[in-house]
Amino acid sequence: MNPLRKKRLIIILAILVGVGAAVGLALSALQQNINLFYTPTQIANGEAPQDTRIRAGGMVEKGSLQRSTDSLDVKFVVTDFNKSVTITYRGILPDLFREGQGIVALGKLNADGVVVADEVLAKHDEKYMPPEVTKALKDSGQSAPTPAKEG
C-alpha cells in the first residue's frame, strides 16, 4: 500500500471513530433525559417501569389531597377516569395546583405502585391541559372537565 493510500485510510478510520464516539455520547445523554409519559391506567396495569424516571399525568381527584402537618410531604391521587394512581411529593406544590385539574408529575414508580415525584407541573390556566393528559383523557373516552366558575 502506498503512503498516500495509507494516510487516507488512517484519516477515514479516525473520522469514523470520532463520529461513532459522538453518536454514542449523544445517545447516552438522550437516554438519561428521556422521561416517558404514562397514564394512571398504564401504571395500574404494570406497563410503567419501576425505579425509572417517568412522567405520570391526569386529573387530581377531588378530596384526595393530603398534606403532612409537620413537613412539606403531600399525597394525592391522579386519575384518567378509568384507573387511579397515588402520587407522593415532598416540596411546595405549584400555585396553580388544585383538585379536579390536570397535572404532570415527574418521578419514579416504587414497588407499591406509588409514584414518588420530585417535580409536579400544574396547568397554566383553566383552559390549558398538558397535551399528554388531553390525549390520555380522549383515549379513555372522557373529555377534559370544564373549569368551575369562581365568584
UniProtKB/Swiss-Prot annotation:
UniProt xrefs under SUPFAM superfamilies: Heme chaperone CcmE
Chief location category: membrane
Stored Gene3D superfamilies: Nucleic acid-binding proteins (2.40.50.140)
Record carries keyword Iron: yes
GO biological process, one term: cytochrome complex assembly
Periplasmic topological intervals: 30-151
Residues reported to bind heme: 124, 128
Gene Ontology CC: one annotated term: plasma membrane
Gene Ontology MF terms: heme binding; metal ion binding
Function in brief: Heme chaperone required for the biogenesis of c-type cytochromes. Transiently binds heme delivered by CcmC and transfers the heme to apo-cytochromes in a process facilitated by CcmF and CcmH.
Database matches in PANTHER family: CYTOCHROME C-TYPE BIOGENESIS PROTEIN CCME HOMOLOG, MITOCHONDRIAL
UniProt protein name: Cytochrome c-type biogenesis protein CcmE 1
Organism: Pseudomonas fluorescens (strain Pf0-1)
